[in-house]
């Protein structure tokens, strides 16, 4: 499986972040073809205190080809263009990963 993860840094204006995430990021993400799962995490802290991140979003696809195909759609292009200014202003970190899960 392949994942696309976005980590939102803590910001002074949390309202703008929440509005962007709820009204833009999440609806576009959920509209991507081939999307298998979405995991959203509200960061509560880290082992040594407060984290610099506030929100994590992980989208899972069957494989890299499925992720690339999804991002090449009109919805995928709009999503990436919406996220780009956040990345350029260092308000998010984002990456793709070849991932696996193990059930215990």
Language-model regions: role of each:
Residues 1-104:
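Macromolecular interaction modules
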């Amino acid at each position: 499986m392949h994942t696309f993860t976005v980590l939102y840094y803590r910001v002074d204006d949390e309202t703008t972040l929440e509005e962007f995430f709820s009204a833009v990021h999440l609806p576009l993400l959920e509209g991507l073809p081939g999307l298998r799962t979405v995991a959203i995490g509200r960061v509560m802290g880290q082992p040594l205190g407060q984290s610099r991140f506030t929100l994590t979003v992980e989208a899972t696809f069957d494989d890299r080809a499925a992720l690339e195909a999804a991002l090449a759609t009109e919805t995928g292009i709009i999503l990436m263009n919406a996220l780009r200014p956040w990345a350029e202003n260092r308000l998010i970190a984002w990456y793709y990963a070849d991932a696996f899960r193990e059930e215990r």
